[in-house]
């Protein structure tokens, strides 16, 4: 078992908060929460998108305006701290509602890793 210092526990909780902020931000299209989840110079490799986190947020906020309900959930968060850097892996489950070109509802369940 790893012995944690107060500082490492605080760091780990801050990382978890970023994951939760992302989920809340994307589900509610909350730009402030989304931007708070990333460093200003962060990059994102998110499905077909690969580029700056700011670019991903801008794209997602426009694309998802027409989406219905979204629910992102995080689990199995593994955080490895290495000095001033961290390696983080988490699993997600996401439910999304959209409409096809005929206006019919499409429900999608996604699972993966962040």
Segments from the language model and where they lie:
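Short, hydrophobic/aromatic alpha-helical segments in well-folded domains
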Residues: 18-21, 75, 113-114
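A solvent-exposed, acidic/Ser-Thr-rich amphipathic alpha-helical stretch
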Residues: 31-99, 106
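Conserved helix-adjacent loop modules within structured domains
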Residues: 105-114
